[in-house]
Amino acid sequence: MSFPKVLNFKISNRRIGLKYKPLIIVELGINHNGKFSIAKQIIDKAKMAGAEIIKHQTHLPDFEMSEEAKKIIPAHTKDNIFKIISDCSLSESDEIKLKQYIQKKK
């Protein structure tokens, strides 16, 4: 089986393709529970484990969720999804500090 050349590309200076080592991308998600110190720990551990990219989303619950989200309660919790995302969101200043922290880790 032959693969098209499009499978070989670069992200910054990192080559991606079948003949290169796998690229490890870590999803930070909301695993930090809205705590900057935990986000930093996850980043540090990810870097130690070989991660080259951290994927992170900024959540703005008041802007990205409707009132309906306050009625949705996932099976594994007693809180609604709006509260969960609100509790697990970083502040704007922490988002900026987190970006700077990640950039220093390069």
Locate predicted features.
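A structural motif corresponding to the C-terminal end of an alpha-helix
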Residues: 49, 93-106
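Active-site glycine- and acidic-residue-rich loops that bind
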Residues: 31-37
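N-terminal amphipathic alpha-helix/helix-capping segment at the start of soluble metabolic enzymes
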Residues: 1-26
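Active-site-adjacent beta->alpha loops and helix N-cap segments on the catalytic face
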Residues: 7, 36, 63-69, 92-95
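Structural/interface elements that position substrates and couple domains in central-metabolism enzymes
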Residues: 22-25, 76-81, 103
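Conserved, mostly hydrophobic/aromatic
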Residues: 27, 46
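Glycine-rich, proline-tolerant flexible connector loops at the mouths of alpha/beta enzymes
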Residues: 52-89
